[in-house]
């Protein structure tokens, strides 16, 4: 790729999260001259520092504590491992450090120039980089990619400066040991932190603004999570919204519109996210966002200005780190070739890192029923698998939805430990074209034994035996 001489760079990428990294690597591999602007002092974006990586590291530490305390091999009922939130945060910090160093190396090896400052548009090809010491410099580029991510949504009536009111970013600076937590918002983030806190024996009240947990999931998966939370002592309030939130010296009171009142040591507000666009100076180039700070793009991730692209959380759905990386790669392809021949896959897998995990890909039973598709269900319970019995992972199941006539796999849903890994075995077959996508593959192939992957053979046999 040859540099257009009137510009400093072929492309400027604003943000170094998964989307920015995918774009930078895609462009650099084709010889483009790249500048990456990151306002945080380290690369990685929200995914590495406040979102995916720390929350999953916390979850892993908690799940291992639970496993130890429940395993009769280690536990004799006289000793129980207990750990505080601040203790397990140290594990998360270690992982964040490893991730940051690795990603810093990616940029350095690919000769991407990094600028640590706040970016804003001066005009459609010029970016000002504002540094913490109040100095600034300007950079120009033929193409600009906005990959600034998102942050927790802050309603004006909630005082997030109060020391007992947290969002999903600031919760990582929790400096006391709560005995009781209220989590407002039962989306993915809210449910994951409900699992983490309950796993640390903290009392958890989960306020859900909808009528069931994670309504986008297959209903059986949603119901399984609800039951598991209930069985572990999480109190869930469905169809509730806050009227007011009062911060106290030693806690917080949440007044609900239904008239209920709830009190706890602290509140985690986890209801919605907002695109990081307010400081970009978009008004200087004629771009505007929706009410949640998100930009509209076409199939090649171009905004209303063809040389300015947007990817990742800043464009909304699907708001997944995995998808953001692919979007960055596709935007790079569009810049290099003038067109993005590839697109995100239709069925993007979802991984939810509650305890136990949930993962799904493809259609739910509710969607197939509404579409009047003649499908059948194959199920495997983890408790019937030798590997699950050996490692003590008896809670969980795998469900395969397939067409009764063609045997084509239509959806896969998994609840249980390692679900986010297990799902990809089925996804690989489901993504095959034509006759390659068939549930009979799992009957006709040979699995290692004992493995969790064997659940696919059990579920396939279960489903095929239902046909007549």
Curated annotation (Swiss-Prot):
Class of this enzyme: oxidoreductase
Entry note: cofactor: Binds 1 FAD per subunit.
InterPro entries (UniProt xref): Class-I_Pyr_Nuc-Dis_Oxidored, FAD/NAD-bd_sf, FAD/NAD-binding_dom, FAD/NAD-linked_Rdtase_dimer_sf, Pyr_nuc-diS_OxRdtase, Pyr_nucl-diS_OxRdtase_dimer, STH_gammaproteobact
Transmembrane feature ranges: none
Species classification: Bacteria, Pseudomonadati, Pseudomonadota, Gammaproteobacteria, Enterobacterales
BP terms from Gene Ontology: 2-oxoglutarate metabolic process; NADP metabolic process
GO cellular component terms, semicolon-separated: cytosol
Task of the protein: Conversion of NADPH, generated by peripheral catabolic pathways, to NADH, which can enter the respiratory chain for energy generation.
Protein name: Soluble pyridine nucleotide transhydrogenase
Pfam families, alphabetized: Pyr_redox_2, Pyr_redox_dim
Organism encoding this protein: Pectobacterium atrosepticum (strain SCRI 1043 / ATCC BAA-672) (Erwinia carotovora subsp. atroseptica)
Subcellular location(s) of the protein: Cytoplasm
Key words of the record: Cytoplasm, FAD, Flavoprotein, NAD, NADP, Oxidoreductase
Molecular-function GO terms, alphabetical: dihydrolipoyl dehydrogenase (NADH) activity; flavin adenine dinucleotide binding; NAD(P)+ transhydrogenase (Si-specific) activity
Family under the similarity heading: Belongs to the class-I pyridine nucleotide-disulfide oxidoreductase family.
Cofactors demanded by this protein: FAD
Assigned EC number: 1.6.1.1
Binding site for FAD: 38-47
The keyword NADP is annotated on this UniProt entry: yes
Matches recorded under Gene3D superfamilies: 3.30.390.30, FAD/NAD(P)-binding domain
Catalysed reactions, semicolon-separated: NAD(+) + NADPH = NADH + NADP(+)
